[in-house]
Amino acid sequence: MTIRAVVRGVGHYLPDRIVPNSELEALVETTDEWIRTRSGIERRHFAAEGQTTSDLAARAARAALADAGLQPDDIDTLIVATSTADLTFPSAATMVQAALGMSRGFAFDVQAVCAGFVYALANADALIRSGQANRVLVIGAETFSRLMDWSDRATCVLFGDGAGALVLEGAEGAGTSADRGILATDLHSDGRFKDLLYVDGGASTGSTGHLRMQGREVFRHAVEKLAETAHTALDKAGLTSADVDWIVPHQANLRIISATAQRMQVPMDRVILTVQDHGNTSAASIPLALSVGKARGQIKEGDLLVTEAIGGGLAWGSVVLRW
C-alpha cells in the first residue's frame, strides 16, 4: 500500500483592485507595449490599504475548503508559503488558522520566495506520507506590491498580489504512476546566487526594503533550472514529458514559461497561463493557476500535471501530481 497526497479541493482569491499596464504608465517611464513584449503581463491585482497577506490567504483557504466540502477543523495542518507575511512573527499560517476558526492541528510558514508553493507541497506530501497529517491545507499568498521600488521601471511592473490554496488528503494508491495525487517532488537551492534576486531589508536593516533583481541572470538560470528539475521529477515518477497533460508553471514571465516549455518539448497549448492577468504573484502564482485552470475547465480529474518554480536564494523545484 502506498499513501498518496491527493488534491481534494482548490480555491483562490484576488484583491478587487485591478491595475492595467496603462495605469503604470503614469507612475514610471514605461509603456503597455514595453511591459507586454518583455513579460506578457497585461494587468495585475493590488491589495487594498490595510489588506494583508493573511487576509488574502484566508479568503483563498475558505474557497478551497468549500470546494473540498470540508470545515476548518477537518484540517490537520496548515502551511502558508509566503515572503510577505504580515509581521516578522507570528507566522502568517497561525494568523490564517485563527481567521478560519481552526481549534486543532498545527500551522507554519514556508519561505522560498517564488518557489515557496512547490516547497510547501513537498512538505505537505512528506507529512501525509509519514502519517503525521491526513489533511493539509497548503496556501500560497503574497502582497509583493508593497516591496516595489517605483523608480525601478524594469522590476516594479512585473509583480502583483493574490492567494491560492489546495486541500491535500491522504489516500491509498497502488504505488504506480497511474495513482492520483503527488507522485514525485524535486527541490534545490544554491545560496551562491543570492544577489541575483533579493529584498534589501529585514530585521538586520530595520526597514522593509525593496525587491532587487538582475533580470537577465535570473532569466538564464530559470530557463536552465526549471526544465531540468521538471525532467528530474518526471523521471522519479517513471514518466516523461510526453505523459504530461499540463505544465502549471510559476507565472513569472511569458518568455521564461515559453522557453521552459520548449526545452521540455511540451507545446504551449498544454501550459496553464495566468501571467497576463495576475503578473508575478510569487508563491501564490502556482495555486492561483491551478484554481483558475480548474475553473476554466482545462484541468480535469486524472490529468497529469507538472508544476515548477524558481525564486530568490536561488531556490527552485518541481512537483509531479495527478489531479
UniProtKB/Swiss-Prot annotation:
Keyword match Protease:
no
Q: What is its EC number?
A: 2.3.1.180
> According to its UniProt record, where is this protein mainly located?
cytoplasm
Q: Where is the active site?
A: 114, 250, 280
Which top EC class is given?
A: transferase
Which reaction(s) does the protein catalyse, per the Swiss-Prot or TrEMBL entry?
A: malonyl-[ACP] + acetyl-CoA + H(+) = 3-oxobutanoyl-[ACP] + CO2 + CoA
Q: What is one Gene Ontology biological process annotated in the Swiss-Prot or TrEMBL record?
A: fatty acid biosynthetic process
Q: Specify the signal sequence span.
A: none
Ranges for the region named ACP-binding are 251-255
**Sorted alphabetically, which keywords does the UniProt record give?**
Acyltransferase, Cytoplasm, Fatty acid biosynthesis, Fatty acid metabolism, Lipid biosynthesis, Lipid metabolism, Multifunctional enzyme, Transferase
> What is one Pfam family matched by this protein?
ACP_syn_III_C
Q: How does it assemble?
A: Homodimer.
Q: What is known of its domains?
A: The last Arg residue of the ACP-binding site is essential for the weak association between ACP/AcpP and FabH.
As for family, the record states:
Belongs to the thiolase-like superfamily. FabH family.
Q: State the name under which the record lists this protein.
A: Beta-ketoacyl-[acyl-carrier-protein] synthase III
Question: Source species, please?
Answer: Cereibacter sphaeroides (strain ATCC 17025 / ATH 2.4.3) (Rhodobacter sphaeroides)
Q: What is the lineage of its organism?
A: Bacteria, Pseudomonadati, Pseudomonadota, Alphaproteobacteria, Rhodobacterales
